[in-house]
Every structure is written in C-alpha cells, then in structure tokens.
C-alpha cells in the first residue's frame, strides 16, 4: 500500500529488515539519555499521510526490550489517519542503567493496520451463556 511520507531527518525512510517483517524500523532524529524508570519523547523527523481506514501502530523493538529494558510506553502507540504532525515515540527505560539514544538509532517499528469502526448495539445485558463467562485475569491457569 502506498503511504505518503515526508522525511525531515537525515535518516533513511522506515525499513523492513527482512521480507517477512511486519514492522518497518524507525530511527531517532535526536540524542537523548533515558534514565532508569524514566521516559522520553523521541522525535523521528517523519510525517505521514495514512489512508483513511488505516492506522500506523508504533511498537517496541524486541531486541531493545530484551537487551536493555527499553520499550514503547504506550504500546502500541496509534497514529490516526488524520494526524499530520511529526511522529514521536515515547520510550521508557525499565533497565537499571541510563540508556543513550543517538541520531539514527532504530528505536521502534511501525505497522500499518486496517481500522474497523464500531457500530454499537446497546443492550441491557450480554449473553452470558459461554463456558468462560466473566472469568478473566489468569482464570484459565498458569
């Protein structure tokens, strides 16, 4: 799918690192240090025009999470089709050491997803005739 993009950074456009990658890696357009338990809004220099009926989700990179405890705070972040501002990524440091972000570092990935708008059917109660019913939060076991 064709998505219009403006790149005001010196970085490459978001890239799919393998043929099977669902997400395209996006890079930092600034330097920052994220302290342990701290978070920062990292600018990318990217502006997109997403077709109506779609969104872009901003998701963590698994390597940053596993190796450094760095993840996207509001994961997945949503970029709506009518947003035209710069893409920013809120990163949080769950690690024990300060984490340096440099210009050009791959900080997150973006995934284009179809959006279905909900048409509500308001009822007084829901059909509770399922085996699970209202059980949740670990009720199916470890």
Which positions does each model-derived feature cover?
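DUTPase catalytic domain/fold
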Residues: 1-142
